[in-house]
């Protein structure tokens, strides 16, 4: 398989050929492929046949199933979300992925108890070359001092739950920004807007985290037929503002959330519609 694996510092892109990956779906190499890319902050699957494939969504879903179980949150649309920003829309109640305002660095669903492990973005069109900004956890941690990391590891932060979820409480329960997983590696679950902090020290720690993350961005510009898979535990992602006189930008994506272990959600996972619930 034409795979280029890099360390988490984003010096290179990881590129996987779609045809060869598709052929591996039922092969004995499936687990090897998954484990090989597990801890990368992102990778690209190239040459997805969007022009010739009349079953784009079904094939996209099958490819994402290589990494785990596609999921959705019960309050946020379909399992495959169509992302086509409107540059003229800026209402706070409109999800950021559907308007033209700057999308600051964040991890996906950080206000949920178990956020998805991956976000897969299939590029349908991108005439304006609008990229996805990615900042890698390893680079971030290298540039933060130990005391700041300790503060970010405290259960001292409540993250804003966006209005479109219709949740009665505006913020999640107290959680850390950074935590260690079962493998001893750091996970990162952050949304910088609307964070409530226990102390001023914790607020300053978040400001340091944001500064370092913003200073170490890699922009990934996807072409039609490329799937960008972002490791939601190992990186933050965002997008610059989209300006256009047109009602809709030329950038159109399909998005799927992926979980490595849906059983961990317990009774908050509905197998019939592949949906998680709660915060």
Describe the predicted segments one by one:
Residues 56-67, 209:
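Short amphipathic C-terminal alpha-helix that caps PH/PH-like domains
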Residues 68-78:
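Short secondary-structure capping/junction motifs at helix and strand boundaries
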Residues 66-70, 124-127:
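Mid-sequence acidic-hydrophobic segments that form the walls
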